[in-house]
Amino acid sequence: MEFIDYDTFGVSDTISTSAGDGALPEPVAILNLNALSFEKPDEHNEINLSELLVDRGTTDGGKNVNLNAKMSNYAKLSMESLHISGTSDNLSVNTLPSYIPDGNKESLDISKLVFQQKNQSLEATNMILNKKLSKILNDYSFSNYQSTSYLRKSLNSLEENKVALSLDENKLTNPGYIGTLARKTLKSDVETELLKEHLTVLEEFRPIVRKIKKLSSSIENIQNLGTSMLKESKENATGTEEPMFDRIKSLRKDIDNLKLKKELLLSIRDQYTLTQVEDDKISNGSVDEELFEIINKVMRIKEKTVFMLGLENPNAGKSLMHEVNNILQRLNRKLFNHLLDILYIFESGTNNVNEKFLSPNEKGVQTFQRSLIYLSNDLEYFNEFLKRVTSLRSKTVLDQFLSQFDFNSKDANPIMLSAYDPLRYIGDILANVYSLIANEADFVRSLFNFQEMQMENTPVSIIQKKDEFLDGLDSKLLNEIIQSLSNTCRIRIGQIIKFEDNPITNFEIVKLLELYKMMFERKGIKSNSSLINNLSALGVVSQEKLIECYSNFVNEIEKTTYVATEDFLPPEWLSDYLVKITDLFEAYEQHGGRESDTNEIIITDTFLEKVIKEPIENTLLKQLKEGFPLAKKEEQARTSLYTVQINCFDLIKSRIQPFASVIFSKDGEKNDVLKWISDKSEEVINQMLELQKKILFDKTGLGMYNNLLNMIFPISSVKDDLDLDMYYSLSENSLMNLDSINTNVHEKLNDYVPIALTDMQGNLLFKLTSPVIADKICDSCFSTLSEFYITFRKTLMHIYPEEEIKIKEILNFSEEEFKTLVGIE
């Protein structure tokens, strides 16, 4: 923009023409208005401005004349700008008629005079500035919209920043010499800033100019050489191609070959070497995405280097491969140290720090996992890191587990063993182990689960390593870490099982062990791990201890002897033993019965044989036989033995039968035990039945004849009179003589049959604890006796039809009478 300056009106030209002095005029001192005499107004009209300078001590006449002319011109222009009446041509420079006050005192009031002059000066200044601004704005160079907008922005910027730029508006618009200096100062400052900006721009071109100057001599040489070559070629022109151009073509071809070689070498350098920045990143940088990109580049270099080994001269490939391996070794060592730092920070950090590190929003886990993926390329470092992880975490987990048994720690809540509740103690131990497994599983899976890792732009070899070494790594580490708890857990639980004699408690322990085995496996513990194997071994020990509880009880019973009582009740120990068994069966039923796989593991067919069958067969029956040593010789002792055995089996069946559908499966081997008990009971009942039949037949005298007839043809098979013909041969037997029959049968039959029912019920049936069995034996015996008596009577009448009356006298009870006497309807 143009600066508004009064000196533009010829002052500078006049000064420049002065002899040998180009300096700007200096401002004069302010006139002392009070020193003037205003009594004679006419005197002031004739003031010569040049005389003022004489009074100030100015002696140079030529200089005063020039200054006087300048001031006259200045005053003239100012008066024209203020529209003062009168023409400027007739106005004398030496007179100021309009501005000299009158001689009276009122007109000489300094304040009014200054105020009036100030208003007039401000008005004159505004008019001059308006003209200047109008001239600038109407300039053709600012007629377009862009220039106008730029000018408007510049003016607005000056207006807004006048305080920051220390612009004094009053000074800049002052028409006096102070305003002139202020505007010149502003102009100088603006020009200085413009010069600085121009210098800044030029400084940017300095390197370019310097390079161009360096090439200037070479360019001149090339130009000169080209000119000489063209001149030489014209002078030596012939009908064939010029030799000079042949050389040029040859040189150009060489240049193209060199360029191609250069491009090839640069491409090889870019593909097979690392930059200095990348090498510095390996040595001093942190592990981040940039380092992973460098690793990918090194791996790609290694993959490409393999092809160089197939060249005729593999030395370059071997050298490059050696260098790449060294770089990979440095990278793997860096990744190894980085992973160890994270591991140690996690071990020594607080829970809040660890949770923040494991947060999905944090990149620490992703960096850790990706570092481990790349580290898997070096199995030595990879396996060493896994060993460090396993050892550190195993120690931490074991310390946390043992702290639960520390009674001296103030912060610990120790697990205490109660003499009355060992099951709770074992449960607390297993619950503590489970919580440690759960926490460790969360930690391991958050760091070592690589299923969702993004592997873009990753070399194929790295991805193959991931699939080979990293899949299932979290489960592998978890099992190796938790392995440290297996022996400690086994020792503490084994101490409880070793001294536990309650079969129900042992059963509950087995159930508890199986439950936590299942829970551990669901958390990722493998079924073949040492912890699961130890729990299985403890379960086997507890099962053996369960069987041992019953075996010890039976072994103590074997040392005693059975003493028969008058009522032939089972031994007292049998009831106690059955109570122990039924308590176990009730616990079995409460825990789900056959629907529980754990129950099926505990209550097996082998267990039932050892706990039920073997004690009955080897202890109970043996003890009962020893209690009746004459049972083989005497029917009465044998009857007592059978009675006790029937009562024992009836007691066993009554206690076990309610659990038949729960424990003794119908299609399994467990049912064999229950079937054996039933068969054994039926066997004893049948033996008792046969014995009672024999006694009954002997007491009635029909025993010998019963055997005789059944030897020829079974009595039970006789259906009609034709079957009686089978017994005709008996007529030749002397025992079948009616007199012999009368002697052997008649008296006994008449004496015992009326009291047979009462005798059997009184001496036998009342001693059997089961009325059903007693009725069964009684009914079967008398039914057999009645059937034989009727058949025997018919047989005699069939053989000796002429002796019917005698036969009726010997066997004097009719069929109805006999049945009535023996209680058969």
UniProtKB/Swiss-Prot annotation:
InterPro entries found in the cross-reference section: COG6, COG6_C, COG6_N
Keywords linked to the UniProt accession: Golgi apparatus, Membrane, Protein transport, Transport
Topology relative to the membrane: Peripheral membrane protein
One GO cellular component term noted in the UniProt record for this chain: Golgi transport complex
UniProt-annotated location(s): Golgi apparatus membrane
GO BP terms: cytoplasm to vacuole targeting by the Cvt pathway; intra-Golgi vesicle-mediated transport
Domain of life: Eukaryota
Keyword Zinc part of the UniProt annotation: no
PANTHER family: COMPONENT OF OLIGOMERIC GOLGI COMPLEX 6, CONSERVED OLIGOMERIC GOLGI COMPLEX SUBUNIT 6
Family affiliation: Belongs to the COG6 family.
Function of the molecule: Acts as a component of the peripheral membrane COG complex that is involved in intra-Golgi protein trafficking. COG is located at the cis-Golgi, and regulates tethering of retrograde intra-Golgi vesicles and possibly a number of other membrane trafficking events.
Protein name in UniProt: Conserved oligomeric Golgi complex subunit 6
Organism encoding this protein: Vanderwaltozyma polyspora (strain ATCC 22028 / DSM 70294 / BCRC 21397 / CBS 2163 / NBRC 10782 / NRRL Y-8283 / UCD 57-17) (Kluyveromyces polysporus)
